[in-house]
Amino acid sequence: MAEEKKAPISVWTTVKPFVNGGASGMLATCVIQPIDMIKVRIQLGQGSAASITTNMLKNEGVGAFYKGLSAGLLRQATYTTARLGSFKLLTAKAIESNDGKPLPLYQKALCGLTAGAIGACVGSPADLALIRMQADNTLPLAQRRNYTNAFHALTRISADEGVLALWKGCGPTVVRAMALNMGMLASYDQSAEYMRDNLGFGEMSTVVGASAVSGFCAAACSLPFDFVKTQIQKMQPDAQGKYPYTGSLDCAMKTLKEGGPLKFYSGFPVYCVRIAPHVMMTWIFLNQITKFQKKIGM
């Protein structure tokens, strides 16, 4: 009987990091969605952040900033649930194997790389839907897909292009996620330890400060891969049915040849502004959710 009573607690203990991670990511996305929309349009060559914002308000209205929100929430429910939950379990196992000692930076980075790959594989279909929905209004009328929501996009993509098309661009998505999570997760833990132990920061100051550092590191590590991923996912065939890029490497080489290395960092200020607050709010929400659960004994 005693073993039967422990089972639900064990299941919740395992599931909790995934639930908390997904919930915190979805809450953060609701706030960051407008900045993410602007970032995508900058990468698609629509102009500066100021001009894009002005044109969207003038021509499309406030609702345009939230186009693709359903896909963004679905992405967090899959990608962030998987990556943050996996990272928590991986680091716990690593600490256990390390006799309870704090992990060195390289082990945190490896856990972040692995968690990012897992999350990207799970969240790739939702990420594809999000990119296409955000880019739709930038296309000529005849080429627009007119998806009504994330589930409509996933259904249409499966029906028109095949189920495997849901993982189009999965390669660069996984690489980008590995780079982002290595920067985000490892630097957050390392910064939090330093700010708390060496600088004497309080709990909230530590969360905010470490989140800002991890957000910048995540942006710097991942933007080149994000740029390539976006180009691959939004590309369409020409009149002869030929795509502009044969794959991620071809896209990267053509971009390097035509625009130089800095082309990969198009929209970096906006991307950094988008990543850092999202990371900060994800950690803050996660911190508050965890505190609330402890308070009520969950």
Swiss-Prot record:
It is a multi-pass membrane protein. One of its GO terms (biological process) is tricarboxylic acid transmembrane transport. It comes from the Eukaryota. Optimum pH is 5.5-6.0. GO terms for molecular function: dicarboxylic acid transmembrane transporter activity; tricarboxylic acid transmembrane transporter activity. InterPro entries: Mit_carrier, Mito_Metabolite_Transporter, Mitochondrial_sb/sol_carrier, Mt_carrier_dom_sf. It is found in: Mitochondrion inner membrane. Keywords: Membrane, Mitochondrion, Mitochondrion inner membrane, Repeat, Transmembrane, Transmembrane helix, Transport. Its main location: mitochondrion. The keyword Protein biosynthesis does not apply. GO terms for cellular component: chloroplast envelope; mitochondrial inner membrane; mitochondrion; plant-type cell wall; plant-type vacuole; plasmodesma; plastid. Highly expressed in flower buds and at lower levels in roots, leaves and stems. The keyword Hydrolase does not apply. The chain crosses the membrane at residues 18-38, 68-88, 109-129, 169-189, 208-228, 268-288. PANTHER family: MITOCHONDRIAL DICARBOXYLATE CARRIER-RELATED (PTHR45618). Catalyzes the transport of dicarboxylates, such as oxoglutarate, oxaloacetate, malate, and succinate, and of tricarboxylates, such as citrate, isocitrate, cis-aconitate, and trans-aconitate by a counter-exchange mechanism across the inner mitochondrial membrane. Substrate preference in reconstituted proteoliposomes is oxaloacetate > malonate > malate > maleate > succinate > oxoglutarate > citrate > trans-aconitate > cis-aconitate > sulfate > isocitrate. Belongs to the mitochondrial carrier (TC 2.A.29) family. This is Mitochondrial dicarboxylate/tricarboxylate transporter DTC.
